[in-house]
């Protein structure tokens, strides 16, 4: 048996992030608390450098390395660059929050970078083994980040819930993968797909168990109903800077794992997992939108909102067409942008000794800051799917994909619950514009955050006016 040296070119961004994360961890040991901005600056440099490397190494051809366990293609390039940019925005929004609570530590950024590395591996994995390693690297980083504020009992409780349910989900996913390995004799996603095509065995009992465990494991990780119980507690209990991270970039990696595992690996069983995803999508749309109405805590409201958005993403996947996959990718990218702005606004209104977690904390925001009230209005309208924001076109693309495969009932169901969901978004707008402020203090004047948050909000309307800019990228990245 001859040993071949693998091609390291496709994994250079991963190696760069790994090396920099380890270096930052060591450098942070010697950086005094007053100079903690050095760690922050190096973390941002790492993300920018990784983005440049990924773009520079991008190729129209699909490349494999490490015995076909690692893939670099259009989907991986787009999602990785999106992860870098979203994480850079998350780090920028988080800095004043961490400083005000005396938890401005280098470990936050190091854990974030290791989480990014896990997402990169997930996005480019083409084997059950690499996919699971990337997933666990991300999960372990997130568990630690949720418990980052050690003085908060609520954060520790949320981290424990997240860890226990995350471990159960990982076990189910791993068990499903092990059954697939027993059936096909391979951990390689392409070989699993080839086996299912050539054997023509159909859905036998072992495959039913394998598919069920894989779907349940993925549903847990995505937070789809009925496996969503960790989402509101973790979003509420974690520091807002961590909720911001959990609610944005990992959704991009979650889409990648579905595309690699279900579409690439288990594509021949599409008609079987389509029904499972339909149930998850319907329940997520219904429960997410209805329960969100009863929330007075905006972090819990956005958590249930996330669950309903997962339902839309699953609708694009279950369509099983090129248009459906592109719509799901477009929707996920849009959601990450909008969610970053939403949680960024919560951080903007928070200050030392005060968490702007309740809807009432947004009362009269228009009187305190008309500009940021307008930014929050754009974000809420986009989440509700109001034209001409980009959220409207994201929902429209998914609905078109579902209608094309003659699942008109599902499209009607989604529209009905989108209208239901519009209530709690518009309630937030009403509170900002028509209620009197309880707090008259001016908003913080952190220039970098104010500028980026403004750009973040304006992107919602710019991409809504020119949706083709992002949609063309999403369509080009999908090769199925």
Swiss-Prot record:
Membrane topology: Multi-pass membrane protein
Enzyme class: translocase
Segments traversing the membrane: 11-31, 38-58, 74-94, 109-129, 163-183, 200-220, 239-259, 273-293, 301-321, 329-349, 372-392, 405-425, 451-471
Predominant localisation class: membrane
UniProt subcellular location: Cell inner membrane
Pfam families, alphabetized: Proton_antipo_M (PF00361)
Reaction(s) catalysed by this chain's protein: a quinone + NADH + 5 H(+)(in) = a quinol + NAD(+) + 4 H(+)(out)
Taxonomic superkingdom: Bacteria
GO molecular function terms listed in the Swiss-Prot or TrEMBL record: NADH dehydrogenase (ubiquinone) activity; NADH:ubiquinone reductase (non-electrogenic) activity; quinone binding
EC number: 7.1.1.-
Biological role stated in the UniProt entry: NDH-1 shuttles electrons from NADH, via FMN and iron-sulfur (Fe-S) centers, to quinones in the respiratory chain. The immediate electron acceptor for the enzyme in this species is believed to be ubiquinone. Couples the redox reaction to proton translocation (for every two electrons transferred, four hydrogen ions are translocated across the cytoplasmic membrane), and thus conserves the redox energy in a proton gradient.
Complex formation: NDH-1 is composed of 14 different subunits. Subunits NuoA, H, J, K, L, M, N constitute the membrane sector of the complex.
Entry similarity comment: Belongs to the complex I subunit 2 family.
Protein name: NADH-quinone oxidoreductase subunit N
Organism field: Thioalkalivibrio sulfidiphilus (strain HL-EbGR7)
Lineage, uppermost ranks: Bacteria, Pseudomonadati, Pseudomonadota, Gammaproteobacteria, Chromatiales
Gene that this sequence comes from: nuoN
């Amino acid at each position: 048996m001859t040993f071949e040296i693998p091609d390291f070119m496709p994994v250079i961004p991963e190696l760069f992030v790994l090396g920099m994360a380890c270096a930052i961890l060591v450098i942070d040991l010697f950086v005094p608390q007053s100079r903690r901005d050095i760690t922050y600056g190096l973390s941002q440099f790492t993300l920018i450098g990784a983005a440049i490397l990924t773009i520079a190494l991008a190729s129209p051809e699909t490349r494999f390395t490490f015995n076909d366990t690692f893939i670099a293609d259009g989907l991986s390039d787009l999602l990785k660059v999106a992860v870098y940019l979203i994480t850079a925005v998350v780090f920028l929004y988080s800095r004043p929050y961490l400083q005000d609570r005396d938890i401005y530590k280098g470990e936050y950024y190091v854990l974030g970078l290791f989480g990014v590395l896990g997402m990169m591996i997930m996005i480019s994995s083409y084997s059950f083994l690499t996919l699971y390693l990337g997933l666990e690297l991300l999960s372990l980083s997130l568990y630690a980040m949720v418990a980052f504020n050690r003085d908060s009992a609520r954060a520790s409780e949320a981290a424990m819930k997240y860890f226990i349910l995350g471990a159960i989900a990982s076990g189910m996913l791993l068990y499903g993968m092990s059954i697939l390995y027993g059936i096909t004799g391979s951990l390689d996603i392409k070989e699993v797909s080839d086996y299912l095509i050539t054997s023509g065995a159909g859905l036998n009992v072992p495959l039913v168990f394998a598919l069920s465990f894989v779907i349940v494991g993925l549903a847990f990780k995505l937070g789809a109903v009925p496996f969503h119980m960790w989402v509101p507690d973790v979003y509420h209990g974690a520091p807002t800077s961590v909720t911001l991270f959990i609610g944005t970039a990992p959704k991009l990696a979650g889409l990648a794992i579905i595309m690699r595992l279900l579409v690439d690996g288990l594509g021949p069983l599409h008609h079987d997992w389509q029904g499972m995803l339909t149930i998850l999508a319907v329940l997520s749309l219904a429960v997410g939108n209805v329960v969100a109405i009863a929330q007075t805590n905006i972090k819990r409201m956005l958590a249930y909102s996330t669950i309903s958005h997962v339902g839309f993403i699953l609708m694009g996947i279950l369509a099983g067409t090129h248009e459906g996959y592109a719509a799901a990718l477009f929707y996920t990218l849009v959601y990450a942008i909008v969610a970053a702005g939403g949680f960024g606004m919560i951080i903007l209104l928070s200050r030392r000794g005060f968490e702007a977690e309740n809807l009432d904390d947004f009362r009269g925001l228009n009187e305190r800051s008309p500009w940021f009230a307008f930014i929050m209005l754009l974000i809420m309208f986009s989440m509700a799917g109001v034209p001409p924001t980009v959220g409207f076109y994201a929902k429209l693309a998914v609905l078109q994909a579902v209608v094309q495969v003659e699942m008109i009932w599902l499209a009607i169901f989604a529209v009905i619950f989108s209208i239901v969901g519009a209530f709690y978004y518009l309630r937030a707008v009403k509170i900002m514009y028509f209620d009197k402020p309880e707090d008259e203090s001016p908003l913080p004047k952190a220039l970098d955050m104010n500028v980026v948050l403004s750009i973040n909000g304006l992107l919602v309307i710019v991409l809504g006016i020119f949706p083709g800019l992002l949609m063309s990228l999403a369509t080009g990245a999908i090769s199925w």
